[in-house]
Amino acid sequence: PVVAEQAAPMVGMPSPIHEFATIDEAAKYMNIMPHLPKVLPVGYNIESVSTINKDVLQVVYVYQAGEDTTRNQAAGKRIVYRVGTTKGDISGNHKDYRVTATEKVNGTKVTFKGGEKMVYLAGWTKDGQNHGMYFERPVNRDMAKAIIANTVAPTAHTAYTK
């Protein structure tokens, strides 16, 4: 006789990552009013919103190419922004970069990582929130500073729906 095998119950930890349709939903889930970048390089739009362990809000922006994709190397490249109240590096990027520099941006100490002129990673703490921003395609330090200077507490987040 053939004996039917019982499917083994799922064993292990539930995923620490939760996807959300909007930044507002993720912020409510975390019970945080996250500071968000109001300025990004032209062409970047929200691709996804998620939380990690209810500690870190992650917003991934992706470059949407215009008419001529052959002329823009940023096509498909992402900017990963994370914010939370946990201490330490929350960027998720632990690569060693040639240059690490610390500068003040509007009175806030910011650590930049990358090359002499180009930035791949920026991290800072402001108003009790810890921030990390990773650029798949590096930006110059002035662009990174402009993004950081304009990462502020929201009055209302821009709607994003999947």
Segments (PLM) and residue ranges:
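Short, solvent-exposed recognition patches
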Residues: 8-126
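Surface-exposed amphipathic alpha-helical segments
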Residues: 127-162
